[in-house]
């Protein structure tokens, strides 16, 4: 490491995965599941160092003997003891960096409750002794990573989706929409519809297989009804998938029926509006003078926006809803799975950002509420 500048650490805490790395890098060094596992029957795990908790991939591989918990639900931290375990694992096992030596940039969900932001700040300064930290809204970082400061971000991950209108770098809270429908729901829906085909996936290990099928084979139809008709008349859309045990299964119209739920949440028994309508409603809540800039800069972010065909379909559906004179542009950056992290890496490397950090001195003077004055 160069002496001239201490590198900041960037940690994007998602419901499904933690993305962590060093500011200035173009991709996170570490991506691991946001899970903490504790032994089901403490004291009987022979030959294992008596650990009271396992984090990430290690928890995943030992899941047969553990009770797994996700401390981040729908984008919001709900279990602070487990969250602290995840951060500890991130610093010491994944990044192998001493937190007391680096400024730390954390990310938060849009509309994160005030108490949560204070708790994050407190844990960083008091448990990890960081010299400085900052909390940034995930969608804002995604927009930065696309090279924009104005636009609307549709951020859809594993636990939650949001539409976040941003003007000149600031999120507009009154117009943010949250949709509790994301990757985990789509994986569960795919399990259900594969069941109808006679493939029984039920355990948590099998759920991981279905997630892989989803990521490798699913796509979004431009016109759902036509795609259904086509799939009934030909077997062109059928693909085979080899299971870990060597068996091969065939996946047909499930390939596009699964992610269609993003546009038709009623498939999952949810009353919510689809992502196209949610984006449109979010824009409608904004001042009429900035709507043109939002319609022309609809930026996709998060792993659940990775489906082939999503850009074309969103463009089509939003064009149908919007005023006819409006130019609609959907931007789908290829690296959007990690664009929140990349935006954090960019932001924390800027020379102009260096005065934005909350320092240990400021924290000691003002306490956790300093986060509301410095991070917005």
UniProtKB/Swiss-Prot annotation:
InterPro entries: Actin, Actin/actin-like_CS, Actin_CS, ATPase_NBD. Its EC number is 3.6.4.-. ATP binds at residues 15-17, 19, 158-160, 214-215, 303. It is found in: Cytoplasm; Nucleus; Cytoplasm, Cytoskeleton. PROSITE patterns: ACTINS_1, ACTINS_2, ACTINS_ACT_LIKE. It catalyses: ATP + H2O = ADP + phosphate + H(+). Residues 40-61 are annotated as: DNAseI-binding D loop. Gene3D superfamilies: 3.30.420.40, Actin, Chain A, domain 4 (3.90.640.10). GO terms for molecular function: ATP binding; ATP hydrolysis activity. Keywords: ATP-binding, Cytoplasm, Cytoskeleton, Hydrolase, Nucleotide-binding, Nucleus. Its main location: cytoplasm. GO terms for cellular component: cytoplasm; cytoskeleton; nucleus. Pfam families: Actin. ATP hydrolysis occurs in the polymeric state. Unlike for mammalian actin, ATP hydrolysis also occurs in the monomeric form and the release of inorganic phosphate (Pi) is more efficient. PANTHER family: ACTIN. A potassium ion appears to reside in the active site during hydrolysis and leaves together with the inorganic phosphate Pi. K(+) does not activate Pi release; however, it may be relevant for ATP hydrolysis. ACT1 and ACT2 differ in their polymerization, filament stability and helical structure. Unlike mammalian actin, Apicomplexa actins do not form long and stable filaments. Actin is a highly conserved protein that polymerizes to produce filaments that form cross-linked networks in the cytoplasm. Polymerizes into shorter and less stable actin filaments compared to ACT2/actin-2; this is thought to facilitate gliding motility and host cell invasion. Has ATPase activity. ATP hydrolysis leads to the formation of a stable intermediate ADP-inorganic phosphate (Pi) actin, which is followed by the release of Pi. ATP hydrolysis affects filament stability; ADP-bound actin depolymerizes much faster than ATP- or ADP-Pi-bound actin. Belongs to the actin family. Monomer (G-actin). Oligomer (F-actin). Polymerization of globular actin (G-actin) leads to a structural filament (F-actin) in the form of a two-stranded helix. Unlike for mammalian monomeric actin, parasite monomeric actin is able to induce oligomerization in the presence of ATP or ADP. Mg(2+), which is used to coordinate ATP, is required for polymerization. Interacts with MyoA. Interacts with DNase I with low affinity. This is Actin-1. It comes from Plasmodium berghei (strain Anka).
